Amino acid sequence: MLLKSLFLLFLTAIAFASELQIGILTSVPDDKCKVKSKPGDLISVHYEGKLEDGTVFDSSYSRGQPISFQLGIGQVIQGWDQGLTRMCIGEKRKLTIPSHLAYGDRGVGPIPAKATLVFVAELVDIAGSSKHDEL
């Protein structure tokens, strides 16, 4: 029975590790969030990216300028397209992105193949909208 329980726990851990994990670090109250990011929006994001061991591989904060891109059309890794959807301006999230939603088997620059990536990302702006627009 113990062996069966351990096996089920192992399978659960594998399944959980293969999915995008989203943690809310800074939330925005509903009455202050009148618009949320959606696919097709041009958004600006400040972020810091780390490997699982804590090694920082990229940071818009260190450059002093957020990155802007169109959400949901493949301009960035899938983990970002999925994890930055339905965010309020000013919201900050921690995204733990498995390799198949990042750079997969190929890796890029300082990011090794099959790496799980951890980002802290803050939505700075949604182009063409104001904080007072309706959803």
UniProtKB/Swiss-Prot annotation:
GO biological process: chaperone-mediated protein folding
EC id: 5.2.1.8
Residues covered by the PPIase FKBP-type domain: 40-127
Keywords noted in UniProt: Endoplasmic reticulum, Isomerase, Rotamase, Signal
Subcellular location: Endoplasmic reticulum
Chain location of the short sequence motif Prevents secretion from ER per the record: 132-135
MF (Gene Ontology): peptidyl-prolyl cis-trans isomerase activity
Chief place of localization: endoplasmic reticulum
Activity regulation comment: Inhibited by both FK506 and rapamycin.
InterPro entries: FKBP2/11, PPIase_dom_sf, PPIase_FKBP_dom
Classification via Pfam families: FKBP_C (PF00254)
Any one Gene Ontology cellular component term annotated for this protein: endoplasmic reticulum
Catalytic activity reported: [protein]-peptidylproline (omega=180) = [protein]-peptidylproline (omega=0)
Segment forming the signal sequence: 1-17
Family: Belongs to the FKBP-type PPIase family. FKBP2 subfamily.
PANTHER family: PEPTIDYLPROLYL ISOMERASE
Role: PPIases accelerate the folding of proteins. It catalyzes the cis-trans isomerization of proline imidic peptide bonds in oligopeptides.
Record-given protein name: FK506-binding protein 2
Annotated source species: Debaryomyces hansenii (strain ATCC 36239 / CBS 767 / BCRC 21394 / JCM 1990 / NBRC 0083 / IGC 2968) (Yeast)
Annotated gene: FPR2
